[in-house]
Regions:
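Short coil turns that delineate tetratricopeptide repeat
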Residues: 30, 64, 98-101, 135, ...
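Alpha-helical segment of the N-proximal tetratricopeptide repeat
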Residues: 32-58, 62, 239
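Canonical positions in the second alpha-helix
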Residues: 58-59, 92-96, 130, 170, ...
Length: 309
């Protein structure tokens, strides 16, 4: 396929963010990334963020209107805790984007940048712009995904009212998809129950949280979305943690995705509550080295680094 800025931005996000639903393409359609992006990614995997940053900045200097170079630079700066500087590059990427898709990608990068600082309001401002793009393409599924991402940022930032609002928008919008299948309906229902359980747990409403956990399990047991089963131990561990049941939380979180920096961070928090400082630090170290630019890393990386230093 022809290599375009649009395709490069899409592939860049797909590699750096596991939740890269923006501009999603099938693997067969993914273009070859520019060599400097591949080199930077390898440096990041090796923990050499300074070297990756230098490489990306060099490319911005030589190609100041490169959307991928500006986005990549902003992502690395966020991971390094330099959000204000990162947003200069996301602003540039937004300004120079050559098409609506690339501009949406840059706006999403800006939203995640604010998530690294726990700023729900600012993140939502930019997620709304991405939502508007998906409205223009009448993509209801992507609208729901973006609304859920905004909600995730807000719950992790401690704004539970905003989180509830955006999760509800995500649920209701996702269901508007023309010709939606029963399985897709179940997916949105499972996500909505999952979200309500977490919000209730954070508000200290444990009985309500358990009601939603039970509802989520009932939907999961229908078997229409087997890939969602991996998210259930995370939910059980999350609810148990905020109920103060730390042994149960640890047991469940250990069944969740061990490569997710948010899960690593929660396991660290759980060990800390159990008085096992060394194990807590072990997991905080893991979480602090995440190289994703998504809500999970936006919460886990800054939180874990504060625990380590």
């Amino acid at each position: 396929m022809r290599l375009t800025v649009r395709n490069i931005v899409s592939a860049l996000l797909a590699v750096l963010s596991p939740l890269a639903f923006l501009l999603a393409q099938t693997p067969a359609q993914q273009p070859e990334l520019p060599e400097f992006i591949k080199q930077g990614q390898q440096l990041m995997r090796e923990g050499k963020l300074n070297d990756a940053l230098a490489l990306y900045r060099l490319n911005v200097q030589s190609s100041p209107h490169s959307t991928p170079a500006n986005i990549a630079t902003g992502m690395v700066l966020d991971l390094m805790g330099q959000g204000e500087e990162a947003r200069k590059y996301f602003s540039k990427a937004i300004a120079v984007a050559g098409n609506p898709e690339s501009q949406a990608a840059a706006n999403r990068g800006m939203a995640i940048s604010y998530a690294f600082e726990g700023n729900c309001d600012k993140a939502v401002k930019y997620e709304k712009r991405v939502l508007d793009f998906n409205k223009s393409t009448k993509n209801f599924f992507q609208q729901g995904e973006i609304a859920d991402e905004a909600a995730r940022i807000c719950i992790d930032s401690g704004d539970f009212d905003a989180a509830y609002k955006w999760y509800k928008i995500g649920y209701e919008t996702g269901l508007k998809e023309p010709g939606i299948t029963a399985a897709r309906r179940d997916l949105w229902s499972f996500r909505w129950e999952h979200a309500q359980a977490r919000i209730a747990a954070r508000r200290g409403n444990q009985a309500e949280a358990q009601t939603h956990v039970t509802a989520a399990k009932a939907i999961l047991d229908k078997g229409t979305n087997p890939e969602q089963a991996a998210f259930f131990p995370y939910l059980q561990g999350y609810v148990a943690f905020y109920a103060g049941n730390f042994k149960e939380a640890l047991e469940e979180l250990n069944k969740a995705n061990q490569n997710d920096p948010f899960i690593q961070c929660m396991i660290g928090q759980t060990y800390e509550k159990l008085g096992e400082k060394d194990r807590a630090l072990e997991y905080y170290r893991k979480a602090s080295t995440a190289i994703f630019h998504n809500p999970a890393a936006a919460y886990a990386v800054p939180f874990s680094k504060k625990k380590l230093f």
